[in-house]
Amino acid sequence: MFVGKSVVITGGGSGIGAALARGFAANGAYVCVGDLNEDAAHRIATDVNGVAVACDVRCETDVQNLIETAQKKFGDVDIFISNAGLAKPEPAHAASAANDVWQLNWEVHVMSHVYAARALLPTMIKRGNGHLVNVASAAGLLNQIGDAAYSATKHAAVSFAESLAISHNDDGIDISVVCPQYVATPLIEMSDDTVVSGSLLSADDAAQQILNGIAAKDFMILPHPQVADYCKIRGADHASWLSGMKGLRRKFLRESETGELKDMHNFV
């Protein structure tokens, strides 16, 4: 499916990124793994016979170095997956997160995608092909209760992906945006081998859905297909959707054993 393709993945040291690295390698791709945790990147790169690069996606020169390393090792980048992400739930009300938390969300969830596109688009446009995959979240289509900074920046990530598609599909460049709900990864304080149930997906299951979507050149990739139904409800009657979300928040606050967002998957 991806034989001979050069693939770069940020946040590739764990979670969905690591599962994607394994999936691409199993399908014949050459994989460059970027991660803030250099040891984790090397561990996954060793597993997939790829190359590892320490990369802080908040830093444009780090993203450029990641791309240049992949180009030197494997040639032109065919597929770039902006997967790095974070979650820092707000301490109190919806505007209570500190400015530096908002800025961190912006840099990781939006500007890292901009940096990758800025570095890759000129050569992709010139050769008339390439695929940019921006991992956002269902929160970028709906909302993440208890984390306004995450929700706002994931909405921005979806919008930027739309701008890329509108502007550059005609240049032969494929654009995908990935909007999962809850996946058992370190982002929600779960290990990659967590036993999953209900709406919680394993990283491997999410990665397979993403690989299928990339192969099909889908713009919107929904590892949790029910998200499409929620979006229809939101679009058809926003007031009713807001009412439902407020009800979900009340239920979570009333019934959650910990009150922590890592338990939210039990309520959706």
Can you say where each PLM-predicted feature lies in the sequence?
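Conserved mid-core segment of classical short-chain dehydrogenase/reductases
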Residues: A87-Q103, G146-A149
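Active-site-adjacent segment of SDR/Rossmann-fold oxidoreductases
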Residues: N27, L142, S163-I173
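Catalytic Tyr-X3-Lys loop
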Residues: L86, A98-V114, N129, A157
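C-terminal tail/cap regions
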Residues: S199-L200, D204-V268
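Residue(s) in the substrate-gating loop at a strand-loop-helix junction
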Residues: S137
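Canonical Rossmann dinucleotide-binding motif of NAD(H)/NADP(H)-dependent dehydrogenases/reductases
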Residues: F2-C32
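Active-site helix of classical SDR
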Residues: A117, T153
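The beta1-alpha1 cofactor-binding region of Rossmann-like NAD(H)/NADP(H)-dependent oxidoreductases
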Residues: E38-D39, C55-N65, N99
